[in-house]
Regions:
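Acidic, glycine-rich active-site loops and adjacent beta-strand->loop/helix elements
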Residues: 15, 83-88, 114-119, 142-147, ...
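Buried hydrophobic positions in well-ordered alpha/beta secondary-structure cores of metabolic enzymes
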Residues: 9-11, 37, 66, 77-80, ...
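Phosphate/pyrophosphate-binding loops at sites that engage ATP/ADP/AMP, CoA/4′-phosphopantetheine
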Residues: 62-78, 234-251, 299-304
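Active-site pocket-lining segment
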Residues: 228-233, 247, 251-270
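Condensing-enzyme catalytic core mediating Claisen C-C bond formation in acyl metabolism
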Residues: 1-51, 154-226, 230, 234, ...
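Flexible, glycine-rich active-site loops centered on histidine and acidic residues
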Residues: 131-165
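Catalytic phosphate/nucleotide-handling subdomain of diverse soluble enzymes
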Residues: 294-314, 324-329
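Conserved catalytic cysteine-centered active-site region
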Residues: 38-57, 85-138, 268-296
Length: 329
């Protein structure tokens, strides 16, 4: 679909907590070891929110960095959207807390919930407000404190997740061939049982739930792996085809940081050199909706991106959801 207005990335920012949880740390908590974790996931450590830190505080810190990169003030923002599966609370929206932290008292703010696909869902939502001519500057955030819903007695899942936030400022641009030029969003609620965190209106939290440790994330690892392997390759192929990109003209693949083996396998099958995938899962683990914007910010600050470069985003997560996007820097 063609658009008359472009929605470009004017600035990026990210923030991760200082506390590191290494594989050796986890080995002292559950029956695992560094070699086992690295071989199966590529993860060596992850960041964990400390006292006084939350999804909103991480998000606000990333947002401030994105504003600085875009040379804007908080007052220049027309809208704030936060993609998260670990909101500050059921309500108000995490984005409202971020707006208040930035000193704003009338800027619209809301959350998007699509688990690990949440950032691409949020990106598309923000871009469409700009394309409609309604807003000029939109803050798009992916932020998570997954440590708060991780069961550190479950060795199959506690090794995977970390906390962090990434943010971008999307801005109106006269050239519709710049910025977000392609995206596709999908969901299949029939797969809801594959990845879930059950406390809610269907299952109000109770003593029995806590006694059975059911307040934490529940993941069917093998099913997730099969789903991710299939969708990763499919989504990138579709995005490249839609934008007439080749392995030579794609500058960078910025995937959801789910598993090093999945990323490596897909890149090989697609005929893409491994160095074209930006990967930081070894340092942060899986940060769900935050993983893509954190990786994008790091790639940008490392000088890996220049104006005109084509960047592909790809993600999949609970819902089940899956999504991809192409941005022309």
């Amino acid at each position: 679909m063609s658009h008359a207005i472009g929605a470009i990335i004017a600035g990026t920012g990210s923030y991760v907590p200082e506390k590191r949880l290494t594989n050796d740390d986890l080995a002292s908590m559950v029956d695992t070891n560094d070699e086992w974790i690295v071989q199966r996931t590529g993860i060596r450590e992850r960041r964990i929110a400390g006292p006084g830190e939350s999804t909103a505080t991480l998000a606000a810190a990333a947002a401030r960095k994105a504003l600085a990169a875009a040379d804007l003030r908080p007052q220049d923002l027309d809208l704030i959207i936060c993609g998260t599966a670990t909101p500050e609370m059921d309500f108000p929206a995490t984005a409202c807390f971020v707006a208040a932290d930035l000193g704003l008292n009338s800027t619209p703010a809301f959350d998007v919930s699509a688990a690990c696909s949440g950032f691409i869902y949020t990106l598309e939502t923000g871009a469409n407000f700009i394309r409609a001519g309604q807003y000029e500057n939109v803050m798009v955030i992916g932020a998570e404190t997954l440590s708060r819903i991780t069961d550190y007695k479950d060795r199959s899942s506690c090794i995977l997740f970390g906390d962090g936030a990434g943010a971008i400022v999307m801005q109106r641009h006269a050239d519709p061939k710049r910025g977000l030029i392609y995206s596709t969003l999908h969901a299949d609620g029939n797969g809801a049982e594959v990845m879930k965190c059950i406390p809610g209106s269907r299952n109000p939290i109770s003593r029995e739930m806590v006694d059975n440790r059911q307040q934490f994330m529940q993941i069917k690892g093998r099913e997730v792996y099969k789903f991710a392997v299939h969708k990763f390759e499919e989504l990138i192929q579709q995005a490249m085809r839609a934008c007439e990109l080749t392995p030579e003209t794609v500058k960078l693949i910025v995937p959801h940081q789910v598993n090093q083996r999945i990323i490596d396998s897909a890149m090989e099958k697609l005929g893409l050199p491994p160095e074209k995938a930006f990967v930081n899962i070894d340092r942060y683990g899986n940060t769900s909706a935050a993983s893509i914007p954190i990786a994008l910010d790091e790639a940008w600050r490392q000088g890996k991106l220049s104006e005109g470069d084509a960047v592909v985003f790809v993600a999949f997560g609970g819902g089940l959801t899956w999504a991809s996007a192409v941005v022309r820097i």
